Every structure is written in C-alpha cells, then in structure tokens.
Amino acid sequence: MYKKDVIDHFGTQRAVAKALGISDAAVSQWKEVIPEKDAYRLEIVTAGALKYQENAYRQAA
C-alpha cells in the first residue's frame, strides 16, 4: 500500500494518524510503501476501500 494513496483517501496525514491511533510523526516517517502492519490495519479500518497488497511486501528471491 502506498503512502500517497492512503493520504489521498483520508485527505490529510493527521486523519490517517487518527484512524490508526498513531502519531502524525509516525505517518510522516513512512516511506513510499507504508509498513505492512499499518497496511493491514487500514484495509480493516476502511472496510476494504484501501487494499493490503501482499506482493508489495514480498521481496523477489
């Protein structure tokens, strides 16, 4: 899941942080691909509007 898509969905970084119960600073430290645990939680919080994409977190062997 990409940080840009998440922020586009929620409108602001602060709204993302509030939805996850984390700090704005934590969200600001995300890279382009957000942490896997947060992606999974966001799929649940958004009732599937944002999708956890397992392949984004698997490295090629």
Curated annotation (Swiss-Prot):
Keywords for the protein's UniProt record, in alphabetical order: DNA-binding, Early protein, Repressor, Transcription, Transcription regulation
InterPro entries associated with the record: Lambda_DNA-bd_dom_sf
GO molecular function ontology, one term from the record: DNA binding
UniProt cross-references to Pfam families, sorted A to Z: P22_Cro
Keyword Magnesium: no
Disulfide linkage: none
Portion annotated as DNA-binding: 13-32
Function according to Swiss-Prot or TrEMBL: Cro represses genes normally expressed in early phage development and is necessary for the late stage of lytic growth. It does this by binding to the OL and OR operators regions normally used by the repressor protein for lysogenic maintenance.
Protein name: Regulatory protein cro
Species of provenance: Salmonella phage P22
Gene: cro
